[in-house]
């Protein structure tokens, strides 16, 4: 069954303003149940975590529900789920934690395909520790990773391989499991940036071979925060700098200060919203907890009796993949019809519905402004993909078009019409 996009779109208040949003890779729009979960948490009885008062128990439950939701989303134990302000902050934190175990003469391997948040923290940690940095290069022909360069970069001295699961500008999906297996053969840990990947694919951290995996709920309908998933055993070997009275258990030892309970509640609601997009999951459901015309359930833990949240997520993301793939094909067909004036740099065989393009002889920021005047939001820039732009010699800015669950065919047609009219304007 296909996702009911009309019903789905009705759950996003911002869409009522008439905009067509193609900036999902930078952050998605927020569905009402997520905003409502945040508001309920902030306006209900709430204290620091504890077990005595109702307000303390509310905070404790909010944290437990958050960890359970992201355990289901990422395929990991709840005790391996760490909250952070952002994926960038978490990567910086864990670069410092891991670098304590490095020694001069060690090496790490990074990827040119990555967002700078999975590059700069490791380079800076390596510089402080006297560790050498090796690179997996980009294959210009495929916009994917050159695995021969990876083989050359690996050595018995490699301590860490950091790689993206999906490029945030090109959409390319590198073979993470293959990369991880080779890293493990030489005794290295693998840190995977899944920020873009988690918005478009069901994540299975163990199946990817990742020792550490980061993602950002605001890229898949949630609030602004970051999540790290890791093996509790591995996390137990890491010793962050922390306050003496603060918890030394895993994963709490990595979370500094009072947690933002309202953000955790919103992040949990985002996972439940994703799980409820599955049309097949409505079978046998009595509808008693349906919310609005979409039948999308608002409350944590509600779902089809006998069907786990992980299974509902699998079904939903399978349907979402089909929906976004069809829209990507419609977009690509329309861009080809515009002729040689548009060059699409996203060309890997396996990729997300994210397209990076340049317009012959035109400034991408002018195109962005032209589209914005027509209610179409498509940003121009380099999107923190510093190594990608340098390796492929891409113009900065370039135009990025990213699809999200709430996009529909009318959005795509508005985008294509806007680009066509821009290309017809005088230079």
Predicted regions and their residues:
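Pyridoxal 5′-phosphate
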Residues: 1-427
């Amino acid at each position: 069954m296909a996702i009911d996009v009309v019903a789905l779109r009705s759950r996003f208040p911002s869409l009522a303003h008439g905009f067509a949003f193609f900036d999902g890779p930078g952050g998605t729009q927020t569905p009402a149940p997520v905003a409502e979960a945040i508001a309920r948490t902030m306006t209900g009885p709430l204290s620091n975590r504890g077990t005595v008062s109702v307000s303390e128990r509310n905070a404790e439950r909010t944290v437990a529900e958050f960890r359970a939701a992201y355990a289901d989303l990422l395929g990991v134990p709840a005790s391996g789920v760490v909250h952070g302000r952002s994926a960038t902050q978490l990567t910086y934190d864990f670069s410092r934690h891991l670098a304590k175990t490095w020694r001069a003469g060690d090496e790490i391997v990074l990827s040119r395909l990555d967002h700078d948040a999975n590059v700069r923290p490791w380079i800076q940690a390596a510089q402080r520790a006297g560790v050498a940095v090796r690179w997996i290069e980009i294959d210009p022909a495929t916009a994917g990773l050159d695995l021969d360069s990876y083989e050359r970069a690996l050595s018995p001295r490699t301590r860490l391989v950091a790689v993206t699961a999906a490029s945030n500008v090109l959409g390319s999906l590198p073979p993470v499991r293959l990369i991880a297996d080779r890293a493990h053969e030489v005794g290295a840990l693998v840190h995977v940036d899944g920020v873009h990947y988690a918005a478009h694919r069901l994540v299975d951290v163990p199946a990817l071979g990742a020792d550490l995996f980061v993602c950002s709920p605001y890229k898949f309908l949630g609030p602004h925060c970051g999540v790290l998933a890791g093996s509790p055993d591995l996390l137990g070997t890491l010793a962050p700098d922390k306050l003496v009275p603060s918890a030394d258990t895993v994963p709490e030892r990595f979370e500094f200060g009072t947690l933002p309970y309202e953000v955790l509640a919103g992040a949990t609601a985002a996972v439940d919203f994703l799980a409820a997009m599955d049309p097949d999951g409505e079978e046998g459901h009595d509808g008693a907890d349906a919310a609005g015309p979409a039948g999308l359930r608002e409350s944590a833990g509600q779902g089809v009796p006998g069907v786990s949240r992980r299974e509902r997520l699998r079904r939903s993301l399978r349907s979402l993949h089909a929906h976004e793939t069809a829209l990507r094909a419609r977009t690509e067909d329309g861009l080809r019809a515009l002729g040689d004036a548009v060059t699409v740099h996203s060309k890997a065989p396996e990729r997300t519905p994210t397209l990076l393009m340049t317009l012959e002889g035109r400034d991408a920021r002018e195109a962005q402004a032209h589209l914005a005047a027509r209610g179409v939001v498509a940003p121009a820039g380099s999107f923190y993909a510093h190594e990608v732009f340098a390796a492929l010699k891409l113009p900065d800015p370039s135009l990025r078009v990213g699809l999200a669950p709430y996009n529909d065919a009318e959005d795509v047609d508005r985008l294509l019409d806007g680009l066509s009219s821009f290309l017809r304007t005088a230079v």
